[in-house]
Amino acid sequence: ETDGKRSRTSYTRYQTLELEKEFHFNRYLTRRRRIEIANNLCLNERQIKIWFQNRRMKWKKDSKLKIKDSL
């Protein structure tokens, strides 16, 4: 049933903080930067890529909500 499905990654506070900090300066990463971050945080490239994809979607959703609230 769960063949091939990865378990959900839980990030440490430090990892989340570092990822958020990076996102604040840049919403998109180059491959080189993604590799650097992955090495620094002991995560793999795919985890970084997916975290940024998810974070961009959250940012987009939050932006839409802010606009709606200001009307």
Swiss-Prot record:
Residues 4-63 bind DNA. It is found in: Nucleus. GO terms for cellular component: nucleus. Keywords: Developmental protein, DNA-binding, Homeobox, Nucleus, Transcription, Transcription regulation. Pfam families: Homeodomain. One of its GO terms (molecular function) is DNA-binding transcription factor activity, RNA polymerase II-specific. One of its GO terms (biological process) is anterior/posterior pattern specification. SMART domains: HOX. Sequence-specific transcription factor which is part of a developmental regulatory system that provides cells with specific positional identities on the anterior-posterior axis. PANTHER family: HOMEOBOX PROTEIN HOX, HOMEOBOX PROTEIN HOX-A5. Belongs to the Antp homeobox family. This is Homeobox protein Hox-C5. The lineage of its organism: Eukaryota, Metazoa, Chordata, Craniata, Vertebrata.
